[in-house]
């Protein structure tokens, strides 16, 4: 239903944000 598809979208967005955050952190630590 709508709820499960919303959960899927939220999971995708969270994964995307986490990936960007990790990359930014890596850049700050190791220097891009």
Swiss-Prot record:
GO biological process per UniProt: defense response to bacterium; innate immune response
Role, per record: Antibacterial peptide with amphipathic alpha-helical structure. Active against E.coli ATCC 25726 (MIC=4-5 uM) and S.aureus ATCC 25923 (MIC=8-10 uM). Has a weak hemolytic activity on human erythrocytes (LC(50)=150-160 uM).
Location within or outside the cell: Secreted; Target cell membrane
Domain characteristics, as noted in the entry: The structure is characterized by a full length helix-turn-helix conformation between residues Ile-2-Leu-21, Leu-22-Leu-25 and Lys-26-Thr-30, respectively.
Family to which the UniProt record says this protein belongs: Belongs to the frog skin active peptide (FSAP) family. Ranatuerin subfamily.
Tissue expression notes: Expressed by the skin glands.
Disulfide pairings: 27-32
Record keywords: Amphibian defense peptide, Antibiotic, Antimicrobial, Disulfide bond, Immunity, Innate immunity, Membrane, Secreted, Target cell membrane, Target membrane
Chain segments annotated as coiled-coil in the UniProt record: none
Protein name: Ranatuerin-2CSa
């Amino acid at each position: 239903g709508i709820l499960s598809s919303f959960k899927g979208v939220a999971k995708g967005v969270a994964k995307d944000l986490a990936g960007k955050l990790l990359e930014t952190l890596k850049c700050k630590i190791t220097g891009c």
